[in-house]
């Protein structure tokens, strides 16, 4: 009887033991598999390493590691020696060779096909096939692990509100030393909300953006029904209205398209576009209007080139051209600005035609999380000689009509955005969204910052001071988390020490760039089957893509062709910027209308 009791206790003890993979024993992208209740095995297949925990490099791997420079060294080389890079940029063969390396080295870090999601920390058909999930770069921490980060740290993470208040909230506006402006900030928000569309009814691990990439559903609508309501069904064009001699989106009343507006917004100011949340701020509606005009402009060009084409072919081909324009602008203007490189990035799909590359993409929840760049937002928005608070700006399309697109572009080109890394620069007005980002990361059981750094071939941080580059916030973080190996991903990205004169720290760039470039170049239009003139209506359509830039987009669609770029020409804080957000009028209770979208999209 006693023997049976001992056996029963032993069995119960084993069944309640922590998953042996909770300690993340497998290194260098080796995969941990439990074998019994207290044993594990690391699968080192094709990692270039071997041994019990995949820690011993193979011969060729050892040589590669000896020769490979650190990410910070590569960044330094690319952001210095301008004279050398000017020469490289003018030698097509050399420029293409370097660009090919940039694309392949980054894309290699992204699993394709996708592997995990919020509910499956192991390979499964469901994780591969179910498009309603965001994928994951790292599997979630197992439910049977003793602590939120596996085995390290306390059984509970620090209060998210306390983390927010101590190291994330803005004391005073910190401008981006890289000179990013509000044209950049709103482009980022507008562009990414075609694939960051969290389905909050199902949970933060789910998405409503089933295209998982650059499909321009934020222009054309996620569903066929929404698309049809937005289309004119004549000459391939989208519906529009003319106000003061200029083209703007149609109204909700005229299209019967669902948009999110507070009930007090007049019907004539409820513009209807592809993304239902773009009525939130006029900066988003500005870009929505520009792309509406661009689509209809391209339709006119194709109609002249192909009078034999019907409405459907004109519409579909114009959409493909706009996808191409978007990718080119993102790589050659947007990513170019973010990188700070003297090397000129190049959009050329043919660079990958002889490489092992999969033309598919799945958006990762970590990519969504790291893109929460709310520190970009200023305390007030300056248009012409007027200054608007958050409260005045929200759901106010009348500002767009009052000033017009020309003044919007000129003003946002001049107004500097905030620095994202370095801590304490999240505006008070969006603190609820930042807190939700922390809470949702916990709900999705993200692994620690250092596990993500190792996953993307970065050395783990050994202290909070190494993370922040200073002592005050490091001390706050140590009091909150106790162990650097327990530091959460999202807060870490915002407190990480920025690279010299840069908007981001190392982790943001080294995690974000692979997701971004794989998503852009994995688009079907970049494949050998699609990337040819006939796909885009001939040489005329192909030329529209290959000559696209943020400046040409503005010139072709905004009266007067105002100068624009993604950085201010003199990266200094604007004179009208509010100095202290915590003492300004942009308090959270001033922006009650955002309650309307909290359940729909914490990305905003």
From Swiss-Prot:
Positions of glycan attachment: 53, 130, 396, 580
Organism: Mus musculus
Domain EGF-like: 18-55
Description of the deletion phenotype: Mutant mice exhibit defects in colonic mucosal wound repair.
Protein name: Prostaglandin G/H synthase 2
Annotated site residue numbers, Aspirin-acetylated serine: 516
GO biological process, one term: cellular response to hypoxia
Catalytic reaction annotation: (5Z,8Z,11Z,14Z)-eicosatetraenoate + AH2 + 2 O2 = prostaglandin H2 + A + H2O; (5Z,8Z,11Z,14Z)-eicosatetraenoate + 2 O2 = prostaglandin G2; prostaglandin G2 + AH2 = prostaglandin H2 + A + H2O; (5Z,8Z,11Z,14Z,17Z)-eicosapentaenoate + 2 O2 = prostaglandin G3
PTM description: S-nitrosylation by NOS2 (iNOS) activates enzyme activity. S-nitrosylation may take place on different Cys residues in addition to Cys-526. Acetylated at Ser-565 by SPHK1. During neuroinflammation, acetylation by SPHK1 promotes neuronal secretion of specialized preresolving mediators (SPMs), especially 15-R-lipoxin A4, which results in an increase of phagocytic microglia.
Primary location recorded for the protein, binned into one broad class: membrane
Induction: By cytokines and mitogens.
Protein task: Dual cyclooxygenase and peroxidase in the biosynthesis pathway of prostanoids, a class of C20 oxylipins mainly derived from arachidonate, with a particular role in the inflammatory response. The cyclooxygenase activity oxygenates arachidonate (AA, C20:4(n-6)) to the hydroperoxy endoperoxide prostaglandin G2 (PGG2), and the peroxidase activity reduces PGG2 to the hydroxy endoperoxide PGH2, the precursor of all 2-series prostaglandins and thromboxanes.
Record-stated family: Belongs to the prostaglandin G/H synthase family.
Active site, per annotation: 193 (proton acceptor), 371 (for cyclooxygenase activity)
Record-annotated site: Not glycosylated: 592
Additional free-text comment from the UniProt record: The conversion of arachidonate to prostaglandin H2 is a 2 step reaction: a cyclooxygenase (COX) reaction which converts arachidonate to prostaglandin G2 (PGG2) and a peroxidase reaction in which PGG2 is reduced to prostaglandin H2 (PGH2). The cyclooxygenase reaction occurs in a hydrophobic channel in the core of the enzyme. The peroxidase reaction occurs at a heme-containing active site located near the protein surface. The nonsteroidal anti-inflammatory drugs (NSAIDs) binding site corresponds to the cyclooxygenase active site. Conversion of arachidonate to prostaglandin H2 is mediated by 2 different isozymes: the constitutive PTGS1 and the inducible PTGS2. PTGS1 is expressed constitutively and generally produces prostanoids acutely in response to hormonal stimuli to fine-tune physiological processes requiring instantaneous, continuous regulation (e.g. hemostasis). PTGS2 is inducible and typically produces prostanoids that mediate responses to physiological stresses such as infection and inflammation.
